[in-house]
Amino acid sequence: MATGRYIVEVEKGKQGVDGGSPSVGPVYRSIYAKDGFPEPPDDLVSAWDIFRLSVEKSPNNPMLGRREIVDGKAGKYVWQTYKEVHNVVIKLGNSIRTIGVGKGDKCGIYGANSPEWIISMEACNAHGLYCVPLYDTLGAGAIEFIICHAEVSLAFAEENKISELLKTAPKSTKYLKYIVSFGEVTNNQRVEAERHRLTIYSWDQFLKLGEGKHYELPEKRRSDVCTIMYTSGTTGDPKGVLLTNESIIHLLEGVKKLLKTIDEELTSKDVYLSYLPLAHIFDRVIEELCIYEAASIGFWRGDVKILIEDIAALKPTVFCAVPRVLERIYTGLQQKLSDGGFVKKKLFNFAFKYKHKNMEKGQPHEQASPIADKIVFKKVKEGLGGNVRLILSGAAPLAAHIESFLRVVACAHVLQGYGLTESCGGTFVSIPNELSMLGTVGPPVPNVDIRLESVPEMGYDALASNPRGEICIRGKTLFSGYYKREDLTQEVFIDGWLHTGDVGEWQPDGAMKIIDRKKNIFKLSQGEYVAVENLENIYSHVAAIESIWVYGNSYESYLVAVVCPSKIQIEHWAKEHKVSGDFESICRNQKTKEFVLGEFNRVAKDKKLKGFELIKGVHLDTVPFDMERDLITPSYKMKRPQLLKYYQKEIDEMYKKNREVQLRV
């Protein structure tokens, strides 16, 4: 591949060795880093300095906001300034030190996004504690594992998560000694905590512990671990990703350089809506960037049904979303179009085509059709508060048709990105006003080197004219390893390169397109990982089936499956339920499909599977998977790419049918 418009080659590719290492493609980096990666300023040593420098620079800027509740109704956003937040952070840090917790100790944070979440994080940063975020949606089992694995001694928790935290006792109390509520503590919770020899504090009570005391902040280094972020898990236990101060500050410098170069730099005037989980790297680094630029962060009320009300009240300028959220926006707009009548639909379609055509010619979105923006698309922009200029999509692929639609109607830049917890978030980001990048994650951010590694067993060649292979990343943003799992670290970290497991394809302009997974683990559109082999083993317990292939499209939020049913079991069921016909016609019958789906749901409930692991559509094939159709290997292992190719029509039909059902609902 000739060097694309947005990348430069820094190293040549290498042919592989027969029976040894596979071939690797050339090493590329962002065109904006052709003279080297941006270096952080000397006084930016740790994550604490990100906040400290903004307090010094913009003490009176509004930093953290939440809606005031008056007579049970949500009012305007009420703000704490950077200086006010700093004062609380110092008090909280003094209290932490007063109970004997200090540099290098592990501090958990458990709950939905809130000002207290950020304040707790900054107190950890100030005193060199390892911040260990806990997913808001994780149950007691996973929380217990993380507390014990990370050896968390102090945990801050949202009020309604205290009971979940207490359920981790007595195992967790080998390490966990203190719990601090973001709000109040009930008498029952105090009794339960004392029963397990845990000390529990309300927020105000804990802040008073450090009154009148002063502790010097410890010296921090860039190589110090800042946070242990546990991945949401695929098979087995969650993995603790060690991210250092260096990882975070180099990530921020790279993103800052990119946004400045494309004239979309964040400033202290920007307003960000915090609703994606802070325990996820995507939102965490975006909020760190907002803090770095002394911008304002407003928090939602934690209910997706009233998210749109919070958006209207906050009027954010930057909006981040996972594809599932943008899919809902798209579906809602399409529904309004359908309900709007012939004339409105005709006007909308005309305006859309006109603006889209001008954008294809290279016109920036704001110049492509100002009249259409004012007359037709204004309501879409107002639906996002009226001030949004930048929409960032991450955590899973965004469907090209949705990205294209939103780029036109949202009157804002819609950028898709790609990154891993292990790469400290953003590694690729698409470029504004480049419609050729639809369906891609854009070129590399100017802080990493990228190369593809061939995957011969899947037919991907990194040295071909159309380079495809496993995406490998090198740079200072990378994690330093999996906590207490050197074996897993060595599996993905080879010669300084992080092997992502994602298969990518370089585009002519230097953008990257994600096309496959090297291992049978993938993400659904809401960003959840699915371990497909594990699920197939679980669903195989259903007596009515012989074999099953589970599939999840990264642009959809649920799973579907192709099943080879048991002839004996299905015909027996059909006889009992008066479903007539031969075996093939019985398998085509919708009642039979609903029966199989019901059996899957029964097993899923028994095995306590998560919602996104449920199968929502099924195709029954009376012919078992075989070698004649190249669907299995001689050792009877499934050939997933071939299965997808063979059943593509059925897969598309299942997703189409489910979408139609959702629209009717």
Curated annotation (Swiss-Prot):
It is an enzyme of class 6 (ligase). GO terms for biological process: fatty acid metabolic process. ATP binds at I228, M229, Y230, T231, S232, G233, T234, T235, G236, D237, P238, K239. InterPro entries: AMP-binding_CS (IPR020845), AMP-dep_synth/lig_dom (IPR000873), ANL_N_sf (IPR042099), LC-FACS_euk (IPR045311). One of its GO terms (molecular function) is ATP binding. Pathway: Lipid metabolism; fatty acid metabolism. One of its GO terms (cellular component) is endoplasmic reticulum. The keyword Methyltransferase does not apply. It catalyses: a long-chain fatty acid + ATP + CoA = a long-chain fatty acyl-CoA + AMP + diphosphate. Pfam families: AMP-binding. Its cofactor is Mg(2+). Residues 495-519 are annotated as: Fatty acid-binding. Gene3D superfamilies: N-terminal domain of ligase-like. Its EC number is 6.2.1.3. It comes from the Eukaryota. Keywords: ATP-binding, Fatty acid metabolism, Ligase, Lipid metabolism, Magnesium, Nucleotide-binding. Belongs to the ATP-dependent AMP-binding enzyme family. Activation of long-chain fatty acids for both synthesis of cellular lipids, and degradation via beta-oxidation. Preferentially uses palmitate, palmitoleate, oleate and linoleate. This is Long chain acyl-CoA synthetase 3. It comes from Arabidopsis thaliana (Mouse-ear cress).
